[in-house]
Every structure is written in structure tokens, then in C-alpha cells.
UniProtKB/Swiss-Prot annotation:
It is found in: Mitochondrion. Transmembrane segments: none annotated. Disulfide bonds: none annotated. This is Altered inheritance of mitochondria protein 23, mitochondrial. GO terms for cellular component: mitochondrion. The keyword Transcription does not apply. The keyword Phosphoprotein does not apply.
Length: 356
């Protein structure tokens, strides 16, 4: 039997332990602690989500949506301001030309700009009373081949709401008004682009408007005001060679915003007679008309009268010794005809003189 000294055995064990002196095993490796690294990252992500949730709650989010990121939370879309003004209103017209439909749609669009609900006031053709309505119902059944729409007045309710007074007019009147609207719109666009000069615009208005003056006169005007203020205004214009058109109507109508449109149909023969006024009112209007004739008799030719004293009237005045302008077509034709006859007569006389 081999005998080994005890000292040698102890020295060998000490040498073995010295070679592993830097290894310290504090925990045995097993299946339970195999995912310890994964748990560390999982806890860190959980903590990050908790902090994010607290931040979401501090910003006033709902508690049930606090666990979701902001980009996944569905929020209702906010309605933009003035969305009703930008909403396209569509009314289907079954009659009329394309131009007539465009004119009607232009009026409808203007109505909704002034009142987003489409509320209007209309004149009842049977009772002749102003009654409330809505353009969606009022437009039904309108035959655009015969008639059209026109805004004759606008009533201001408050700072935001207005109620237009809508009237049914002849198709030609509606188309004429729409053409004027497009012309003004195009002129404005050209001026903004710099294509049309302001001086040119002023020149055109000078030719068309400056020579023709409009004066409003109420049937209820006092006699002193008519003989002094109005008489001075009318006579001054006639002396300068301006043509003057006088508009006579009731005080409430003559002071409306679109008072001129009430006189558009007086240039043609009216169907039917307006209701008869009380004798005192009729005599008052007759006195106003007679006073106007006396005022202008010295400075103007015989006035052209349109309308009826029971309703409204137009008095067209041309100053004396002034040739009619182009818009007086009949008078211009007569003048040219007379000039041609005079020239022809002179030629005949010259021919006779040469033959002799």
C-alpha cells in the first residue's frame, strides 16, 4: 500500500483553490433564473409605459384611453369655422336655359351668404303682403323660362343675420341684372391684375353715368322742401346740361337699399290698374307732380312720364337746347332722319340750280 504524506495532500488542495480565487458563484444556474436578463428589460419597458401613462393623464386625457399612445387615440373631427358658409347649396332647376339657371343660382348663393338658413321674405302676389318663407321652398315650381329671382331689399336683424326680400321678376330683368353682376366682377378682376386702369374705369363711368343724374322724391315731401331744396338741386343739374330722372314713390320704398329695382318694370306697359288711393292722398301726390312740372318747365323740354300716381312714377327730363344722347334711341333716330331729309333736300336744290 502506497502511503502519501498528509502535507503533500494539503499543499495540492491549496494550489487548486488558488487557481479559482477570482470566481465567486453566488447563485446556482437553473431554469428559474435563465430569463433574468429578459426580466430586467421587461421591467424597464413597463416602467417607461407607466411614466408615459402618467404624462397622458396630466394632459387631461380620458382614463380609459390613458394606456394608448396619442397617435392611436381616435378623436372626433372638429367642424371648421364658417363651415355652413362654405357648404355648397344645390337647387335643381327643371326649366330655363343654362344662363337663366346660372342667374337663379347666383341669387340663391347671395341669399345664403346673407342668411345661412335660407330664410327670406317674399311679397304674396294675391294679398300683396310681405310674408316670411325659405328659399328652399320658395324656389320650387318657379318657371325660369318666364320669370327669375331678384333681391330687392335686405333687412338687418343683428350683426350677423340678415333677411333678404326676394321678388319674382321677368326673365329678361333677371338676366340683365346677372349680366351686370358678371361685368362688374370681371372688371374688378382685371383691375386687381393691373390689366384695366382706374382712369379707364372712371372714363367709362363718366360717359355713361355723369351725364345722367338720378333724384329720389317721396310722395310725402313737404311743399317747402320741394320748392327750395329739391328745386335747387334739379335746376342746377339742368343748367349744367345734365339729363335728370326723377323717381317718385312712397317714403318707405324710396329709402330702401335697392330702391332703383322697384322702377325697372315701369318702362313697359303695366297690366291692370293699381288700387285706388284715398282722395286726400291722391290730391297730395297730384300737387307734388304739378309743382315739379312748374319747376322744370323753364329749363327742360316736356317731361316724359311713366307709371301712375296711385303707385310710383318716373319723370325723365332733358335740358333745353341739348341734343339727345345715344340711350334715347327714338329721339336719336328722329334727329338722324331729319338730318338726312335736310341733306337730300339740299342736294335736290343744288341739282336744280346746276341744270338751270
Amino acid at each position: 500500500m502506497l502511503k502519501v504524506p498528509l502535507s503533500d495532500v494539503l499543499s495540492q488542495k491549496m494550489l487548486f483553490l488558488k487557481s479559482f480565487r477570482y470566481f465567486h458563484c453566488t447563485k446556482y444556474f437553473s431554469r428559474d433564473n435563465a430569463s433574468s436578463t429578459t426580466d430586467i428589460f421587461r421591467n424597464a419597458m413597463k416602467r417607461k409605459r407607466e411614466l408615459a401613462n402618467l404624462k397622458e393623464q396630466s394632459h387631461g386625457n380620458v382614463a380609459r384611453n390613458a394606456a394608448f399612445p396619442k397617435e392611436y387615440i381616435k378623436r372626433p373631427k372638429q367642424v371648421p369655422r364658417n363651415a355652413t358658409n362654405r357648404k355648397k347649396i344645390l337647387i335643381t332647376w327643371s326649366t330655363g336655359t343654362d344662363r337663366a339657371k346660372e342667374a337663379a343660382n347666383s341669387v340663391v348663393s347671395e341669399i345664403f351668404k346673407k342668411n345661412h338658413k335660407g330664410n327670406i321674405k317674399v311679397v304674396d302676389p294675391t294679398t300683396h303682403r310681405i310674408e316670411p318663407s325659405n328659399i328652399r321652398y320658395f324656389a320650387k315650381g318657379i318657371d325660369l323660362d318666364k320669370v327669375g329671382l331678384s333681391i330687392v331689399n335686405v333687412e338687418q336683424i343683428d350683426n350677423e343675420n340678415q333677411i333678404p326680400l326676394v321678388k319674382i321678376v321677368e326673365s329678361r330683368v333677371a338676366l340683365k341684372k346677372y349680366s351686370d353682376f358678371l361685368a362688374k366682377k370681371k372688371e374688378k378682376e382685371l383691375m386687381e391684375l393691373g390689366v384695366l386702369n382706374k382712369s379707364y374705369k372712371n372714363l367709362v363711368t363718366d360717359k355713361k353715368e355723369d351725364n345722367l343724374k338720378h333724384i329720389k322724391i317721396s310722395w310725402q315731401i313737404e311743399s317747402d322742401d320741394l320748392k327750395r331744396q329739391k328745386a335747387h338741386e334739379i335746376v342746377s343739374l339742368l343748367k349744367k346740361g345734365n339729363k335728370v330722372t326723377l323717381y317718385l314713390d312712397d317714403k318707405n320704398n324710396i329709402n330702401s337699399n335697392n330702391w332703383l329695382e322697384n322702377f325697372e318694370e315701369l318702362d313697359r306697359s303695366q297690366k291692370g290698374e293699381p288700387p285706388r288711393l284715398p282722395e286726400s292722398v291722391f290730391q297730395k301726390r297730384a300737387a307734388v307732380l304739378e309743382t315739379l312740372k312748374e319747376i322744370v318747365s323753364e329749363y327742360a323740354n316736356d317731361p316724359v312720364l311713366l307709371g301712375n300716381m296711385n303707385s310710383k312714377m318716373i319723370m325723365k327730363l332733358i335740358p333745353k337746347d341739348v341734343k339727345p344722347q345715344n340711350n334715347d334711341k327714338r329721339a336719336l333716330k328722329e334727329l338722324r332722319k331729319k338730318e338726312r331729309q335736310e341733306k337730300l333736300q339740299k342736294r335736290i336744290q343744288r341739282k336744280k340750280m346746276n341744270e338751270m
